[in-house]
């Protein structure tokens, strides 16, 4: 409970100030970004946190989660509102699968969109996707943010 307290108190305060219908939160269970290890009880932490946040009636919960389908299903069962789900590294042929299955109301594609400035055109034309380069994330320069090629660049 103590590990979840800040997130719950912050979400509660924001919802009270601007309205729960204008408040959302993003969680990244099982993220190992920058060597984070949330410990053996992290699944229980997220179950508790999502159940508490659900009671606030927030606009949506945004989960970024690469694996552990059982945990995703558990969190979905605890969250009655809108769910935005991001699956980093998800293959293109699985885009839309979480919506089609009813697991999520919306899917997000952060890293894929970042690496493909013409993302919509690539989807519409079934064009190839640029792979994202995580080594450029948060690097302090424009490398990795504005230098990915478009389909037109590749054709030239």
Map each language-model feature to its residues.
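Flavin-dependent oxidoreductase catalytic cores
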Residues: 1-156
